[in-house]
Amino acid sequence: MARVTVQDAVEKIGNRFDLVLVAARRARQMQSGGKDALVPEENDKPTVIALREIEEGLITKDVLDARERQEQQEQEAAELAAVSSIMHNR
């Protein structure tokens, strides 16, 4: 198990409160959203993996926001294509 120094992760995010929010959000993505870890898992829990990703500079609030916007746009485009297909088949 890799040792995570929270202080290093705090320095990447800015403050410990935002760190908790970003790490929890990323851990939730990995646990329930099917998102793959960006660092080796090494039998760590999603929260530890999230902290390691933050510490290595791979995940920030901006990165999470951009990914969610992109996924939302892709989902909306797929829904629009499905509706369009239904309308053309009538």
UniProtKB/Swiss-Prot annotation:
Catalytic activity from the UniProt record: RNA(n) + a ribonucleoside 5'-triphosphate = RNA(n+1) + diphosphate
Entries under InterPro entries matching the protein: DNA-dir_RNA_pol_omega (IPR003716), Pol_omega/Rpo6/RPB6 (IPR006110), RPB6/omega-like_sf (IPR036161)
Top EC group: transferase
Cystine residue pairs: none
Entry GO MF terms: bacterial-type RNA polymerase core enzyme binding; DNA binding; DNA-directed RNA polymerase activity
Keyword list, A-Z: DNA-directed RNA polymerase, Nucleotidyltransferase, Transcription, Transferase
Protein family (similarity comment): Belongs to the RNA polymerase subunit omega family.
Function field: Promotes RNA polymerase assembly. Latches the N- and C-terminal regions of the beta' subunit thereby facilitating its interaction with the beta and alpha subunits.
Protein name: DNA-directed RNA polymerase subunit omega
Source organism of this protein record: Vibrio cholerae serotype O1 (strain ATCC 39315 / El Tor Inaba N16961)
